[in-house]
From Swiss-Prot:
Glycans are attached at residues 40, 267, 377, 435-436. InterPro entries: CUB_dom, Sperma_CUB_dom_sf, ZP-N. The gene is CDCP2. Its main location: membrane. It comes from Homo sapiens (Human). This is CUB domain-containing protein 2.
Length: 540
């Protein structure tokens, strides 16, 4: 245990090293590592005037698994509208990264209490060469029960989790997003004493100020994923005088760290992209399309911390894709480093991307584009195409919005499908030579345009008539990829047959037609017999 704390303190001193050297140069002793379970600290000379040109850094480190509650007893710094002169900055973690900044403060109004989302918090005090005030005095403690949480993401646990929580506890947390953003709360473990009305031990989640619109949860069934009505979510945990449980663990996400996308196509990126993403975040992006669709994601840029050099696995910062709306869905892929992954496609209408970062080393992050893919069955003969699309996938659309080559070749509704049957000499088909093979090609259009906004999806339909093999490929032109079009030109190339079959939905494969071979053989045989007959006649 002592060795672990020693290593932790060495790490803290290394992180604070540059700040401590700067303070020594100014001749002012301040800052340091605070590792006791609780304590107090203040600006230099407090309560007298603090010195000019001073910068102090405090790193508060408590036992792992705990959190830090920071409160202020006194506060008096030079005032400025943007706190550009003298100021106090509070960071959620060890790194003074903008993404971890909980707030910058000056003037005479004390900052509110702050709770870290893990066991480390940083405080930086800065004064310039003009105007000094009395400074500040603050206190901290570990293992807090409740508090105000303001980071992009973090973890929330019951007291002493995963051990049983104490009796007669009452904890209040306020999770507050910046600006107009919402807060998302996801429970990953839950075991609280239960009864039918949750009147003994419970977790209550309130969507706004006051005890209104609240939901109470108890027992061992995890609560559903909850999203705030506004920019704030309140969580209350209460236990009675007997019978406990393991408690709960939940992740919260806010702002650009949690989004739900429901448009047919779009782009998004990691927080602060293309600048470095913050440390210690866990972000969710959910793509949710109407039933019947699949989601295809293209990676336009990826720059994360490199894999573990020993295990060669993504043990540190990583981006994961799940085939559904939660982390319990099948994993489609897990990536780190800077090599672009291939596109991934969901099997149904939802896909989740998760970004996890640790306490050190940040990079540029990622940028992706996605599009809703319509599963379809395409087959062909030596003379025509047949395309079948389930009406469930295109329920909001009229059949005339689905057409091959031109609007005159619109789909017909047959049973539960939209069907297009088109000869190779109609509907904009053309013959091309690809990989020394003759193929017939046309373009299938699905028009989602509405309210004056054009949105037409294009699929290349391809047939090799001699083998009666058909395939379909998503055509993604650069017009929908925004500023990343130059990096996504490869999307316009059709994938090989097996990739198209795996990623673009079912493709009908028909056995090779041997009638042409038989016909050619008969012609050759007839020619040989004719030559033999002529020779015999000449000999006679």
């Amino acid at each position: 245990m002592l060795a672990e704390w020693g290593a932790c303190l060495l790490l803290a001193v290394a992180l604070l090293g540059p700040g401590l050297q700067a303070q020594a140069m100014e001749g002012v002793k301040c800052g340091g590592v605070l590792s006791a379970p609780s304590g107090n600290f203040s600006s230099p000379n407090f309560p007298r005037l603090y010195p000019y040109n001073t910068e102090c850094s405090w790193l508060i480190v408590v036992a792992e698994g705990s959190s830090v509650l920071l409160t202020f007893h006194a506060f008096d710094l030079e005032y400025h509208d943007t706190c550009s002169f003298d100021f106090l900055e509070i960071y959620n973690g060890a790194s003074p990264d903008k993404g971890n900044l909980l707030g910058r403060f000056c003037g005479k109004v004390p900052p509110p209490p702050f709770t870290s989302s893990w066991h480390v918090m940083s405080v930086i005090f800065h004064s310039d060469k003009h105007v000094a005030s009395h400074g500040f005095s603050a206190g901290y403690q570990k293992d807090v029960c409740g508090g105000v949480l303001t980071g992009l993401s973090g973890v929330l646990t019951s007291p002493e989790y995963p051990n049983n929580y104490p009796n007669s506890m009452e904890c209040h947390w306020v999770i507050r997003a910046a600006g107009p953003a919402h807060v998302k709360l996801v429970f990953v473990d839950f075991q609280v004493e239960g009864n039918e009305e949750c009147t003994y031990d419970y977790v209550a989640v309130l969507g706004g100020p006051g005890p209104t619109r609240g939901h109470h949860y108890c027992g061992s069934t995890r609560p559903p994923t909850l999203v705030s009505l506004g920019h704030e979510l309140q969580v209350v945990f209460k236990s009675d005088f007997n019978i406990g449980g393991r408690g709960f663990k939940a992740y919260y996400f806010s702002g650009e760290c949690q989004e739900v996308y429901m448009a047919m196509r779009g782009n998004f990126s990691s927080p602060q992209y293309p600048s470095s993403y913050p440390n210690n975040i866990r972000c969710h992006w959910t793509i949710r399309l109407p039933p019947g669709y699949q989601v295809k994601v293209f990676f336009l840029d990826l720059d994360l911390e490199e894999p573990n050099s020993l295990t060669k696995t993504c043990d540190f910062d990583h981006l994961a894709a799940f085939d559904g709306a939660s982390e319990e869905a099948p994993l489609l892929g897990n990536w780190c480093g800077h090599h672009l992954p291939p596109p991934v496609t969901s099997s149904h209408n939802q896909l989740l991307l998760l970004l996890h970062t640790d306490r050190s080393t940040t990079r540029r992050g990622f940028s992706v584009a996605y599009i809703g893919v319509v599963p379809m069955n395409v087959s062909c003969s030596r003379t025509d195409f047949q395309i079948l699309i389930s009406t469930q996938a295109l329920a909001p659309l009229e059949r005339t919005k689905v057409y091959l080559g031109s609007r005159s070749c619109a789909a017909q509704e047959v049973g539960g499908n939209l069907r297009i049957q088109a000869r190779f000499d109609t509907c904009g088909t053309e013959s091309q030579r690809r990989n020394n093979t003759s193929v017939i090609v046309s373009v299938l259009y699905i028009d989602f345009s509405a309210a004056g906004r054009e949105d037409i999806h294009e699929y290349e339909v391809r047939c090799e008539p001699r083998r009666k093999e058909a395939s379909v490929h998503l055509l993604s032109g650069s017009h929908w990829l925004g500023p990343y079009a130059a990096t996504a030109e490869h999307l316009q190339e059709a994938p090989p047959m097996d990739e198209a079959e795996a990623l673009e939905g079912p493709v009908s494969m028909v056995a090779q037609d041997t009638s042409d071979i038989v016909f050619l053989g008969l012609c050759i045989l007839a020619g040989i017999l004719m030559v033999i007959a002529i020779v015999v006649l000449m000999l006679l």
